[in-house]
């Protein structure tokens, strides 16, 4: 990996968001309690699939619910592949949805290479750090509907460029 140009790497992963995300800390005047509202019901999970390169976020897609092979294949085929250039290296973690031969075939047909991270090593993927920053922005937005959550994700992604 030492001989690889970092500009060729595209890290792809997914993260979950929901409509009850709120800031974890608050401020208040001395002697007063910090107050905030948090819904009791988390609502359905909205999964964000995104790719990160040295130039910033490559492409993103949201879907209600979790990620399986079919959802990941749609993301790769309709969102990631149009944004890739031949010769780029797509780096993913070892989730089962990333491993089918169809995913590898799609990426290699575009002239790119698919590489898997070692098991249990999310700290090797910089997209995890980007998701942490995105989630901080989404918590501050306090989106309580799916439409508001999608809008907050779009704004957060635009700030990450």
Descriptions of predicted regions:
Residues 1-161:
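Short functional hotspots at interaction and active-site rims
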């Amino acid at each position: 990996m030492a001989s690889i140009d970092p500009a060729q790497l595209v890290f792809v992963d997914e993260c979950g968001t929901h409509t009850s995300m709120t800031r974890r800390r608050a401020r208040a005047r001395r002697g007063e309690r910090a107050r905030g509202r948090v819904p009791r019901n988390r609502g359905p999970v909205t999964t964000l699939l995104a790719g990160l390169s040295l130039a910033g976020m490559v492409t993103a897609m949201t879907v209600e619910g979790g990620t399986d092979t079919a959802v990941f294949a749609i993301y790769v085929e309709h969102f990631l592949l149009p944004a890739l250039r031949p010769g780029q290296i797509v780096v993913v973690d070892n989730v089962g949805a990333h491993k089918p031969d169809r995913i590898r075939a799609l990426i290699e047909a575009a002239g790119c290479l698919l590489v898997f991270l070692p098991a249990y090593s999310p700290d090797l993927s910089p997209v995890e750090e980007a998701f942490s920053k995105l989630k901080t922005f989404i918590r501050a937005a306090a989106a309580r509907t799916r439409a508001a959550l999608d809008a907050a994700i779009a704004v957060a992604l635009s700030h990450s460029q």
